[in-house]
Swiss-Prot record:
Originating species: Bacillus subtilis (strain 168)
Name of the gene encoding the protein in the UniProt record: gamP
The name this protein goes by in its record: PTS system glucosamine-specific EIICBA component
Segment forming the signal sequence: none
Main location: membrane
Function: The phosphoenolpyruvate-dependent sugar phosphotransferase system (sugar PTS), a major carbohydrate active transport system, catalyzes the phosphorylation of incoming sugar substrates concomitantly with their translocation across the cell membrane. This system is involved in glucosamine transport. In vitro, when expressed in the absence of GamR and NagP, can transport N-acetylglucosamine. In addition, plays an important role in the phosphorylation of EIIA-deficient PTS transporters. The EIIA domain can transfer a phosphoryl group to EIIA-deficient PTS transporters, enabling growth with maltose, N-acetylglucosamine, sucrose or trehalose as the sole carbon source.
Domain PTS EIIC type-1 intervals: 3-382
Length: 631
């Protein structure tokens, strides 16, 4: 049950990042257009309209995020939210309810929570009914067209139900808001719990009600009422920003101090290497407020430090509150947001002295703990720890392929997504995931909870996810078996080896392949062949590493350690093995020229995107490829 609950919360957490991602752009427009900066109302209003419609944006964002980017789910969410809103208004009149506050636009206002509910509903109904087949008479409304229809009806029902339930929930939220707003202890626990949830990626769920629902403020100039700490702050509420202000000293001063402590306690021979990594991580935290590169450098090797870190983060919020500091952000508590939004802050200058004091506390406390308890923070590992291996020499455009290998290959991926700083993956077989390889490829940390993995690759995580999905869509085999060959064999091929072309035909460059996975060399260097016959033979003596289930691709390892992928045709994975016959099995030793695979060339030309066959040397650089002898 815990496994399933964690997976659902993970999915919701990453889905919430879709609408949250638009806030920095809206915040920039809102601030630059404000009176204390450019004083251009048209720019300010362009940003303000996003904040005014946050519930609708959350509805669409959550729906699309949970439905795998499907626009139909987003359309259904728009329709569903509009129906929910009007249903709540009409039910409020029937029930004789009074406006929740003076000037309220709606008698029952669920705010962002209503948008999230509709987003969840639209995504669920999309997954449930997007393939439905209706009676031929109603055939036009089958499949995806049915989703907005069923969402409309369901939203009406949800609206009726919540017209009775939501007023009670709203009273509870208001009571909790008042309690926490007046409680320093409550603020401490908020900040500490928020920080403790970050390793699990569940903090997005935790902060949402605080940022977008708790507390209310009526703009005296417009009469508009907004709720939530973040939205109130940007509407000009001088009391807002209480649940954000402590992040500024933590991210701008304290985490860089942690990075410095890690550098100073590293082994002498490793300080230069560790300095480069930690200084980069510290600057990322200082400027943008992205904390994972620093936090995950010590989280897994010294969990006790992260507990201390989280408690101190709570103390920072308390101290800032005692000095009546109020400051906010649209992205995170880094230096950019600090400077940009300073004009809206109250006692924002206090962040600097508080940050400096706590930076000293963090530095000396972390330094003492690392040395006293001999914690294996970066740069302090011994050779026996197995953590001193250099990161795999993988070209940037090939990283996605190797990460997919480390995750156990395409067949092992049940769900793949990403947020700002981490890949979020659900796998079928956790034992096939190589966490050490993920770290060698650049992940600063890997979190495993049952079948769910989070690999912290920083801000490139989302682009990395897209590259992996592109590779998976092309049906490229990346298996755990292939991974073993990467780690156990030499990375450079034997220069004395001589290869033969695995297929007869015209040799062309990878740039001629009509698939960007190959043409952009995401998987490695090589060439392509336009086949003249349907036979694939072993290019050298070696071993069959893997055969894709649909038999359209073979992973091969030569006796000298050269990895070769032979991918027959483009989009041939969609043929489901039709027209292919394998003559070898995974793990089988073969001789140069031995028949590996036969395929119906005419069938592939008729049913696939192209018969052109990429031959990829997956562990060979462009320079090394020049020395490979082909005949």
């Amino acid at each position: 049950m815990f496994k399933k609950a964690f997976q659902i919360l993970q999915q919701l957490g990453r889905a919430l990042m879709t609408p949250v991602a638009v806030l920095p752009a809206a915040g920039l427009l809102l601030r630059f257009g404000d009176k204390d900066l450019l004083n251009i109302p048209i720019i300010k209003d362009a940003g303000g309209v996003v904040f005014d419609n946050l519930p609708l944006i959350f509805a669409v964002g959550v729906a699309i995020g949970l439905a795998g980017g499907e626009g139909v789910a987003g359309l259904a969410a728009v329709i569903g939210y509009l129906i929910l809103t009007v249903t709540l208004d009409n039910m409020g009149k029937l029930l004789g309810l009074q406006p929740p506050y003076e000037g309220a636009e709606h008698l029952i206002d669920m705010g962002v929570f209503g948008g999230i509910i509709i987003g969840l509903l639209a995504a669920y109904l999309y997954k449930r009914f997007s393939s439905i087949e209706l009676h031929p008479v109603l055939g036009f409304f089958s499949g995806k067209r049915f989703v907005p229809i069923i969402t409309s009806v369901s939203s009406l029902v949800i609206g009726v139900i919540f017209s009775f339930v939501w007023p009670l929930i709203q009273n509870g939220i208001n009571a909790a808001s008042s309690l926490i707003a007046d409680s320093t202890v409550g603020l401490f626990f908020y900040a500490t719990i928020y920080r403790l949830l970050i390793p699990f990626g569940l903090h997005h769920i935790f902060y949402t009600p605080f940022y977008f629902m708790m507390g209310e403020y009526t703009d005296p100039s417009t009469g508009n009422t907004v709720t939530g700490d973040l939205t109130r702050f940007f509407a000009g509420d001088p009391t807002a920003g209480r649940f954000m202000m402590g992040d500024f000293p933590y991210m701008i001063f304290c985490l860089p101090a942690v990075a410095l402590a890690i550098i100073h306690t590293a082994r002498p021979e490793k300080k230069k290497m560790i300095s480069g990594v930690m200084i980069s991580a510290a600057l990322t935290s200082m400027l943008t407020g992205i904390t994972e590169p620093v936090e995950f450098s010590f989280l897994f090797v010294a969990p006790v430090l992260y507990l201390i870190n989280s408690i101190l983060a709570g103390v920072i919020f308390v101290v800032c509150d005692l000095f009546h500091v109020r400051h906010g952000y649209t992205f995170s508590g880094g230096g950019i947001d600090y400077v940009l939004n300073y004009g809206l802050s109250t006692n924002g200058w206090v962040v600097i002295p508080v940050g400096i004091v706590f930076a000293f506390i963090y530095y000396y406390l972390f330094r003492f703990a690392i040395l006293k308890w001999n914690l294996k923070t970066p740069g302090r590992e011994t050779d026996e720890d197995g953590q001193n291996e250099e990161k795999a020499p993988v070209a940037k455009d090939q990283l996605a392929f190797h990460v997919l290998q480390a995750l156990g290959g395409q067949q092992n991926i049940a769900n793949l997504d990403a947020c700002i700083t981490r890949l979020r993956v659900t796998v079928h077989q956790p034992s096939q995931v190589c966490k050490d390889e993920l770290k060698r490829l650049g992940a600063v940390g890997v979190l495993e909870v049952n079948n769910n993995f989070q690999a912290i690759f920083g801000t490139k995580s989302d682009a990395l996810k897209d590259d992996i999905k592109t590779i998976m869509a092309g049906g490229v085999p990346a298996t755990a078996a292939a991974l073993d060959t990467v780690t156990d064999k030499p990375l450079k091929p034997d220069s004395d080896e001589t290869f033969i072309y695995p297929i007869k035909g015209e040799t062309v460059s990878l740039g001629d392949v009509p698939d960007q996975v190959f043409s952009e060399k995401m998987m490695g260097e090589g060439f392509a062949i336009i086949p003249s016959e349907g036979k694939v033979v072993a290019p050298a003596d070696g071993e069959i590493v893997s055969i894709f289930p649909t038999k359209h691709a073979i992973g091969f390892m030569s006796a000298g350690g050269t990895e070769i992928l032979i991918h027959v045709g483009i989009d041939t994975v969609k043929l489901n093995g039709e027209g292919f016959e394998a003559h070898v099995t995974s793990g089988q030793a073969v001789k140069q020229g031995e028949l590996l695979l036969t395929f119906d060339l005419n069938y592939i030309k008729q049913h696939a995107a192209s018969a052109i066959t990429p031959v990829i040397f997956t562990n060979t650089s462009e320079e090394d490829l020049k020395h490979i002898q082909m005949k």
